[in-house]
Structures are given as C-alpha cells and as structure tokens.
A protein has these predicted regions:
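Acidic anion/phosphate-binding donor-loop and adjacent secondary structure
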Residues: 45-49, 78, 91-108, 114
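Nucleotide-activated donor-binding/catalytic signature segment of Leloir-type glycosyltransferases, i.e.
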Residues: 162, 167-188
Length: 264
C-alpha cells in the first residue's frame, strides 16, 4: 500500500506540515479527512489577537497535533484540548558522527589550525532586506558572546554556513573578528564542519529544535544553548544559559551524546 499520495482526495490522513499551509487545501477535503497539524514552536504573539483567531479557524479542521519538543507541547496545551502527539527529532548516525582527526579537517576547509573555532550554522538575517537581524534566532546575542570571547581568547575564529548570514558577517567585520564562511554545503561537509569546532553556540530566543542540538550531540561537538526547543531534553543543565550567565555555561559532550544517540 502507498504511504503517501499526491491527490489528497485519495488520502486517509492529511498532514499539515506547517500551520500556514492549511489554507492551501480545500475546506471540503479537510472536513472529510483525519487532519494532523505540526506545530514546531509558538511565540508570545500566537496566544492572542489575530494569531489566536487564525489558530481557532484552523483548529476546526484539525483532529490532533504533532510537536517535536516537550516545551512546545506544554505551550500548545494552553490553547487546545485536542490530542498532542510528541515525536522528537530523529538523527541519522550514518550522516552525523564523530571524527577524531580535526587537524586534517581544518586544513581541508582552510580553518586556522591553532584557532579556537566557534560555529553557527543557521540563518540570522531577515529575508525582506538581507540586513536586519532575525531576532528570533538571536544573532545579536551571538555577536555579544563572541565579542566577549574574542577579548579573552587568542585566535578566535567563527565558522559560518548557510544562507542569509549577512547580519552576523557585517557585525564580525565591524569587530574585526576572524571568520570562515561556507555558504551552502552537503551533509558530508556539514558533518566535517561540526567536527572542526571547539564550540557551537545556539543563541535563539524561540526554536522548535533546533536540529543543530542533536547534530552536535551525536557528533560530540561541544555545545551550549539558550533554553529553547529541545535544549533541555538533550543538553546538561550546565550547558544551558541566559544572557546573564553565558560565560559560565559548560559543554557536556558525553551527556549530549547519550541523549542524542537515542534518536538514531
């Protein structure tokens, strides 16, 4: 039997993989099918006004919800009585794994071998102007942290990947902080880049995941993070920080690996 079909009329279940996509399907179809809607994160604005009204309009057609973090499940329970299914992120150990020879990797990607390398692999800039920081991802926080680190650590290098990195790059250049930028890379390369790092930092204000947390965990990449998304499910409490105590955060690679490998 087919697991998925292109024609929703032939489906037993309709999966709204992102909340806004519900408007792309006919109400007639949604009424006649079992509908599951994935909610990856909720922001403060989602609990009132036009955003809550939009949620209520969509909820008429939703039978149950899917979330990837317990934090989102708890938030969602405040605005719905419908069933919420928690299925956490998964991670493929054939793609993401530890590589011991970090010196060779740094040489391969022209990363200074003697540097303390800090990674950030997610977009940081709004798409409408390619200048403004995407504040939900916390790039302003990232810059504050690496600026302080740069004053205390010799030979700091920031390693960036992904599109829409204009804000962070501009700020790094203002501060004269060394960086290496590899825009779009495949999984093999990204795994090698994780393995080139001394530290990965998640500075987001709100997240569904991010996937980088489990990818760091299973590759044994040292990571610290704000308390967003799945952070508290994967990372040791000492690896989770706020902007008042970030310099005290300590990576625990064994703890993160143990929790991430369960998702393989």
């Amino acid at each position: 039997a087919e697991v998925s079909v292109e024609d929703p009329k032939k489906a037993d279940l309709v999966w709204i993989i992102s909340p806004w996509l519900w408007k792309k399907e006919s109400r007639k179809i949604l009424k006649s099918k079992t509908v599951i809607c994935s909610i990856f994160h909720l922001e403060d604005k989602d609990f009132s006004g036009k955003y809550l009204k939009e949620f209520r309009r969509r909820e008429k057609y939703v039978d149950f919800y899917h979330v990837i973090s317990l934090k989102t499940k708890k938030d969602l329970e405040n605005i719905t009585d419908k069933k919420i299914v928690y299925i956490p992120f998964w991670v493929n150990g054939n793609i993401w794994f530890d590589i011991e020879d970090k010196e060779t990797l740094r040489d391969k990607y022209s990363i200074p071998k003697k540097s303390f390398v800090v990674g950030s692999f997610q977009r940081d800039t709004e798409g409408n102007d390619l200048i403004s920081p995407k504040l939900i991802k916390g790039p302003d926080r990232f810059i504050k942290i690496v600026d302080q680190m740069n004053s205390e650590i010799d030979n700091l290098t920031v390693l960036l990947t992904g599109k829409r990195r204009q804000y962070v790059i501009a700020e790094l250049e203002k501060l004269k902080i060394n960086y290496v930028y590899l825009e779009m890379v495949d999984f093999k390369t990204l795994n090698e880049l994780y393995n080139s790092l001394d530290l990965y930092i998640v500075t987001s204000r709100i997240e569904g995941g991010p996937q980088a947390i489990v990818e760091c965990g299973i590759t044994r990449t040292p990571i610290i993070s704000t308390d967003v998304g799945i952070a508290s499910e994967i990372l040791h409490k000492n690896s989770i920080f706020n902007m008042n105590n970030y310099m005290n955060a300590k990576p625990d690679t064994d703890f993160a690996f143990k929790n991430s490998v369960k998702l393989d």
